[in-house]
């Protein structure tokens, strides 16, 4: 079988940092999974209010 590239759907995008496909934060063009986002959100300028 030949491997094909996924062009659309949930598995088409991946985290820029670790490559994970689940739990992706796409808002504002971030494209990080939720785990990586929590680790570097403060460095990116996001603040936790509650």
UniProtKB/Swiss-Prot annotation:
GO CC annotation, single: cytosolic small ribosomal subunit
Subunit structure: Part of the 30S ribosomal subunit.
Protein name: Small ribosomal subunit protein uS14
Family matches, as SUPFAM superfamilies: Glucocorticoid receptor-like (DNA-binding domain)
Disulfide-bonded cysteines: none
Domain of life assignment: Archaea
Coiled coil region boundaries: none
Family under the similarity heading: Belongs to the universal ribosomal protein uS14 family. Zinc-binding uS14 subfamily.
Any GO MF annotation of the entry: rRNA binding
InterPro entries: Ribosomal_uS14 (IPR001209), Ribosomal_uS14_arc (IPR023676), Ribosomal_uS14_CS (IPR018271), RIbosomal_uS14_euk_arc (IPR039744), Ribosomal_uS14_sf (IPR043140)
Residues engaged in binding Zn(2+): 15, 18, 33, 36
Keyword Ribosomal protein: yes
Keywords associated with the record: Metal-binding, Ribonucleoprotein, Ribosomal protein, RNA-binding, rRNA-binding, Zinc
GO biological process: cytoplasmic translation
Function of the molecule: Binds 16S rRNA, required for the assembly of 30S particles.
HAMAP family per record: Ribosomal_uS14_2_A
Co-factor(s): Zn(2+)
Gene: rps14
């Amino acid at each position: 079988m030949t491997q094909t590239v996924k062009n659309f759907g949930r598995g088409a995008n991946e985290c820029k940092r670790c490559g994970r496909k689940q739990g992706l934060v796409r808002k504002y063009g971030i494209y990080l999974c939720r785990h990586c986002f929590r680790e570097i959100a403060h460095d990116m300028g996001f603040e936790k209010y509650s």
